[in-house]
From Swiss-Prot:
Chain ranges of the VM domain: 52-88
Lineage: Eukaryota, Metazoa, Ecdysozoa, Arthropoda, Hexapoda
Name of the protein this chain belongs to: Vitelline membrane protein 15a-1
Primary localization class, coarse: secreted
Tissues showing expression: Expressed in the middle and posterior regions of the follicle cells.
GO MF, one annotated term: serine-type endopeptidase inhibitor activity
Organism: Aedes aegypti
KW Cell cycle (keyword) present: no
One GO cellular component term noted in the UniProt record for this chain: extracellular space
Places the protein is found: Secreted
Family to which this protein belongs: Belongs to the vitelline membrane family.
Cleaved signal peptide residues: 1-18
Region (Disordered): 87-108
Length: 108
């Protein structure tokens, strides 16, 4: 039994000490030429209109959706409405959750 163990250790040591050469590197082949002439460059694409859009009339508003329609709107705002402000002011500092007495015992 000892002979088999010694033989296995010897085979393992010889295999670990072997200096194998690096595997040969094979570069991929160059791509085949598709055509022997150069392709012309594509035409430039212009993403603008040749003229400016017409000015919208004051009395009509185009509503675009599933069913486009034209809604007539007045040129001036309706009377009686105050100008709308943003979302309002921030809440005052006295609007906060009241402090309870049950937490005062932990602060001492």
């Amino acid at each position: 039994m000892n002979k088999f163990i010694i033989l296995a250790i010897f085979a393992l040591a010889v295999g670990a000490m072997a200096d194998y050469p690096k595997p040969a590197y094979h570069a991929p082949p160059p791509p085949p030429p598709h055509h022997l002439h150069a392709h012309p460059a594509p035409a430039p694409v212009v993403h603008t209109y040749p003229v400016h859009a017409p000015h919208a009339k004051c009395g009509a508003n185009l509503l675009v959706g599933c069913a486009p329609s034209v809604a007539h709107v007045p040129c001036v705002p309706l009377p009686g409405h105050a100008p709308a402000h943003g979302y309002g002011h921030a809440p005052a500092p006295h609007y906060r959750a009241p402090e309870s007495d049950s937490f005062d015992q932990f602060e001492e």
